[in-house]
């Protein structure tokens, strides 16, 4: 059950401004918000194409990655970013913390999927999605939800899990999508007056847990710990 509000995930090869790793160094540190399984594949591809580099990856949630970058602004510890939400990436471009990089074939990438100056290049789109465990729903005699509004049904109390929007890019996507979907006038009013906040307050009454990972709600739901996980799907 995908919902509107597609956001880009970005893949850039951008050396931080002031980064202390010069050309010829063997070690490259990569920060990433990609899922662990994806990082493994990215590392395989990178090490195959760049055998002379020792690529070290550090995986962080979307919010944690941003906080770490800011904390290290005067003493950068990373050289590259793989897979970070463009909504976050765009906040760091004006801060002068990213150097443009245009990969081979840059001119073939549609304008919507890249920064015009080359600060980021998109690798995919991802959408907010509801992930029900049909077995749990059947065992507990719970109805199959058809959309977000159905999650307000008190029968789901304690059976929902969602990523924390303060630390998870997926959680941020979900909240941002709801703000757009539930209030047609969202562009003309302060965000705190958006009608979706009333919905989120009611949803909170049914929420069993908020977690920092965007994929964990789907995984825990699949394991049978929850009936419905608020997670994401790639497009």
Question: What are these language model-derived features?
Answer:
Residues 222, 227-235:
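C-terminal lobe and pocket-closing loops
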Residues 1-9:
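Bacterial N-terminal signal peptides that target proteins for export
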Residues 33-40, 63, 77-223:
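Extracytoplasmic ligand-binding site segments that recognize negatively charged/polar headgroups
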Residues 27-29, 54-55, 77-79, 224-227:
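Short active-site oxyanion
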Residues 67-75:
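Short, well-structured alpha-helical segments in soluble
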Residues 28-58, 130:
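Short, polar/charged alpha-helical segment
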Residues 9-19:
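Bacterial N-terminal signal peptides
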